[in-house]
Each structure stands twice: as structure tokens, then as C-alpha cells.
């Protein structure tokens, strides 16, 4: 099992596939909504949803990062969208979407210690990725099949933006986030 994530290892031990585990997590998510139904439909379609090779729709994973006392929320000012938002990014072939969310928070904020509050989904949504230029090439509009996890980090820990993606990173009160 070397090289497998904790969740993949647990799924293998329990005799379930990672896809089945993700479907079960999405199925348990409440409130039920049309995005949930569409995510389940696409998972059943046997499309490659974990890489950007699927130009129409692919998985992204995000994180709502809170302080241990829940008085602050970490946000990044994303250059592409010209707005403050929660942190996250593309799965890029990784089927462990919690690991993707953790990786993206570390990359986009400079935090070295961040931990899941729970392995359950915090939210799920289908987001439209507008057409844009990336690395000198045009990327057509597409769908981000996004799952969000609730993570926790210490607001006293050093943070810094990832200059190619965001210009600022900061902690906000939940009301301001």
C-alpha cells in the first residue's frame, strides 16, 4: 500500500473503491441539491473527472480554513477571479480530494501545518471556470466539480501568497469572509 493515501488505504482495507467512498460521501451530503445529483451522475459516467484532460468538467477540491476557536477564516485574493475566495485547486489526477485540499492550502497560503476538522464534505458545488489564458494558451470555459473540506490552522503561523495565483492571503472574521 506504499504511495496510497490514508483514505485510499482505508477504502482498500474495507473492500471499497475510492470512487465508491467518494460517491457515499456525496450521497450523505445534506442538503440535497441539483449539484449533488449532477456530481453523482458524472461519477457514474466513467468520464475522467480527476484530470484537466477532461476539458468540459473535472474535480477541484477546496478548503474553508478556520482558526481553532472558529473566530477567523483564511482567504486568498485570487488573481484570476480578481476577488477574495477560499483556497483550493485542481485534483490533477489525485483521487484523494481531501489530500488535494490540504496540498492547495499549503501551496496557496504558505501554511505548513493545517489539519482536517473532519473527513466529511463541508460543501459541494459546481462552479463555472471562465475561459482564460494560462501559460500562453487559451483554456475554454468549463465546470469545476468542487468539494470543500473544513480545515483548521493557527492564525499566528506565518502565511504568504503564492505569487502566480494570488496576491494576498489573510485571516478574516467569519462575518467579513
Enumerate the predicted regions with their spans.
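N-terminal strand-loop-strand
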Residues: 50-86
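A short beta-strand motif that forms part of the nucleic acid-binding face
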Residues: 78-80, 90, 165
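Alpha-helical and coiled-coil interaction segments, frequently adjacent to or embedded
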Residues: 1-38
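Unchanged
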Residues: 92-177
Amino acid at each position: 500500500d506504499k504511495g496510497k493515501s490514508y483514505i485510499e488505504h482505508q477504502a482498500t482495507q474495507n473492500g471499497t473503491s475510492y470512487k465508491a467512498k467518494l460517491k457515499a460521501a456525496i450521497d450523505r451530503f445534506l442538503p440535497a441539491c441539483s449539484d449533488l445529483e449532477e456530481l453523482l451522475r458524472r461519477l457514474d459516467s466513467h468520464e475522467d473527472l480527476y484530470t484537466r484532460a477532461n476539458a468540459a468538467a473535472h474535480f477541484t477540491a477546496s478548503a474553508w480554513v478556520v482558526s481553532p476557536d472558529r473566530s477567523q477564516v483564511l482567504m486568498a485574493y485570487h488573481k484570476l477571479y480578481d476577488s477574495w475566495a477560499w483556497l483550493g485547486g485542481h485534483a490533477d489526477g489525485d483521487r484523494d480530494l481531501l489530500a488535494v485540499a490540504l496540498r492547495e492550502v499549503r501551496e496557496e497560503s504558505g501554511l505548513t501545518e493545517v489539519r482536517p476538522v473532519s473527513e466529511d464534505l463541508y460543501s459541494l458545488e459546481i462552479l463555472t471556470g471562465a475561459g482564460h489564458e494560462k501559460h500562453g494558451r487559451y483554456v475554454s470555459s468549463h465546470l469545476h466539480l468542487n468539494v470543500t473540506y473544513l480545515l483548521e490552522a493557527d492564525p499566528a503561523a506565518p502565511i504568504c501568497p503564492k505569487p502566480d495565483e494570488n496576491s494576498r492571503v489573510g485571516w478574516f472574521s467569519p462575518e467579513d469572509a
